[in-house]
Curated annotation (Swiss-Prot):
Domain of life: Bacteria
Gene: rnc
Keywords: Cytoplasm, Endonuclease, Hydrolase, Magnesium, Metal-binding, mRNA processing, Nuclease, RNA-binding, rRNA processing, rRNA-binding, tRNA processing
Native species: Rickettsia akari (strain Hartford)
Domain spans labelled RNase III: 4-133
GO molecular function ontology, one term from the record: double-stranded RNA binding
One protein family per Pfam: dsrm
Entry protein name: Ribonuclease 3
EC annotation from Swiss-Prot or TrEMBL: 3.1.26.3
Cofactor: Mg(2+)
InterPro entries (alphabetical): dsRBD_dom, RNase_III, RNase_III_dom, RNase_III_sf
Length: 227
């Protein structure tokens, strides 16, 4: 297990109360085995962290997406606080290396379990909030989620770049575009392009290949917000 000091450097935050940090990283399996002598785990902090993350993300979207209506804001928030996004953030922090768990949980694959990474990440947010204040927590979440929020800003006017950044942020291969159909006369052709990222595919049409690629990327990004 790595030292907590390394994790704190990655977060850009040093805990005043180390007990909060330990609690945020303690898997529930520890309480089920008395030989480990842990009387707390991250479940209560996870509950609070989920609410804090939703509040902070909602506020960030409200301030930065003034032209978006309630429905669009809700879709973006769902994407930013979904399990996959939280897991990506936790993975970038190498959070799995810091979770304290029983030997049995570890050999069962618990360190790589996305649920454990998500839960610990939410608990860590709550621990930061309790150890500091909402402003500090807002700044840390803003930094950790920055690339995902940036993607939302790019989606409408530069969806190809937004999709590429989403792929990179999610540790996937870069998008692959393929022309699959061309219809109509030479001066008024309609092009259909297929874009693929990991297991996700989407088609888009346009009066040029560039336009078709842009539409495919935008539609795929909108789909990914609902995943």
């Amino acid at each position: 297990m790595q030292s907590f000091e390394t994790l704190e450097k990655l977060l850009g935050y040093s805990f005043k109360n180390q007990e909060l940090l330990i609690e945020a990283l303690s898997h529930p399996s520890l309480r089920q085995h008395h030989e480990y002598k842990y009387d707390k785990d991250y479940e209560r902090l996870e509950f609070l962290g989920d609410a804090v993350l939703n509040l902070v993300v909602t506020e960030i979207l409200f301030r930065n997406f003034a032209s978006y209506n309630e429905g669009n804001l809700a879709k973006i928030r769902s994407y930013l606080v979904c399990k996959e996004t939280i897991c990506v953030v936790g993975t970038k922090l190498t959070l799995k290396d810091y979770i304290i768990m029983t030997y049995g949980e570890e050999v069962a694959g618990g360190r790589d379990n996305p649920n454990n990474i998500e839960n610990a990440m939410e608990a860590l947010i709550a621990a930061i909030y309790l150890d500091s204040n909402i402003e500090t927590t807002r700044n840390i979440i803003g930094k950790l989620w920055e690339e995902f929020i940036k993607i939302q800003n790019l989606t409408d006017y530069d969806p190809k770049t937004a999709l590429q950044e989403w792929a990179q942020a999610s540790s996937h291969h870069l998008p692959i575009y393929r022309l699959i159909k061309r219809e109509g006369a030479a001066h008024s052709s309609t092009f259909t392009v297929l874009v693929k990222v990991k297991d996700y595919e989407q088609t888009g049409t346009g009066h040029s290949i560039k336009e078709a690629e842009k539409n495919a990327a935008r539609d795929l990004l909108h789909r990914l917000q609902d995943v």
